[in-house]
Amino acid sequence: MNHSLKPWNTFGIDHNAQHIVCAEDEQQLLNAWQYATAEGQPVLILGEGSNVLFLEDYRGTVIINRIKGIEIHDEPDAWYLHVGAGENWHRLVKYTLQEGMPGLENLALIPGCVGSSPIQNIGAYGVELQRVCAYVDCVELATGKQVRLTAKECRFGYRDSIFKHEYQDRFAIVAVGLRLLKEWQPVLTYGDLTRLDPTTVTPQQVFNAVCHMRTTKLPDPKVNGNAGSFFKNPVVSAETAKALLAQFPTAPNYPQAGGSVKLAAGWLIDQCQLKGMQMGGAAVHRQQALVLINEDNAKSEDVVQLAHHVRQKVGEKFNVWLEPEVRFIGASGEVSAVETIS
């Protein structure tokens, strides 16, 4: 166990793995998985490690997916992109804008790789991946069989997909298909974007505004290790939301399809006066309460303790129980993040 995982997770938590393998194509990925499995080892496939918290040393092989490549098909109604899972997400967003293919600008600066984007159904500022996803290409690890799932088959939900359930361990994502409509329509429902004029705004202006909001509010993982939003924004019933708003009328709330209401986890945490709170080397970020940071050589236990404290305080004040968006990795694979911090 002497391969440090510190360079492979944006939290900068220092645990080890038995083996770390970089796979630059599908065959290398399959070979690494099949070799490790034959040895009886657990296997974890990572992109940029921007949404994981390692709780302890990993007793197996970590495969870093570095499958690259971007192919573009120009159709009358849309541009269709076939993108390797190992491509950096933000670089893809910049590239599509430079090439005059807008549609991803609200998702600028989301850390991580393209292959991770469907797992979480990444989203920001009113847009989720499912809006632009055409398909996801996977490989069945045991057989090498290729499978293409349509966007519908991916069963996208809020920070959720089939890749967190049936497809979690048996398949690896090798490419993502995107469909960017030529009739561009800006999404200006959140934050500073609401100030932009929908009749004159350009994709580049939306991109610039999103980048500005993210860089001013969110810490740079190279300075303070973090995994972006630590908690999901809770989605509650209309009754729960109504009761909460009666008591806290200024609480941000976003009605969802089906009658439920999404609340802002960052606001709930902020109302508990937790910004800047520190436990061991972990802290709640001072600008954006939704982000927990590695302030000073944090151990995973520090982050877990802090997350538990935040969850308890918010639960006691609002009777709303936050769930981590970050995936928790134990010695032999993913464990329940909610149970870990409960």
UniProtKB/Swiss-Prot annotation:
It comes from the Bacteria. Residues 13-183 form the FAD-binding PCMH-type domain. Keywords: Cell cycle, Cell division, Cell shape, Cell wall biogenesis/degradation, Cytoplasm, FAD, Flavoprotein, NADP, Oxidoreductase, Peptidoglycan synthesis. One of its GO terms (biological process) is cell wall organization. Pathway: Cell wall biogenesis; peptidoglycan biosynthesis. One of its GO terms (cellular component) is cytosol. Gene3D superfamilies: 3.30.465.10, UDP-N-acetylenolpyruvoylglucosamine reductase, C-terminal domain, Uridine Diphospho-n-acetylenolpyruvylglucosamine Reductase, domain 2. It is found in: Cytoplasm. Its main location: cytoplasm. Its cofactor is FAD. Its EC number is 1.3.1.98. GO terms for molecular function: FAD binding; UDP-N-acetylmuramate dehydrogenase activity. SUPFAM superfamilies: FAD-binding/transporter-associated domain-like, Uridine diphospho-N-Acetylenolpyruvylglucosamine reductase, MurB, C-terminal domain. It catalyses: UDP-N-acetyl-alpha-D-muramate + NADP(+) = UDP-N-acetyl-3-O-(1-carboxyvinyl)-alpha-D-glucosamine + NADPH + H(+). Cell wall formation. NCBIfam families: murB, PRK00046.1, PRK13903.1. Belongs to the MurB family. This is UDP-N-acetylenolpyruvoylglucosamine reductase. It comes from Shigella boydii serotype 4 (strain Sb227). The gene is murB.
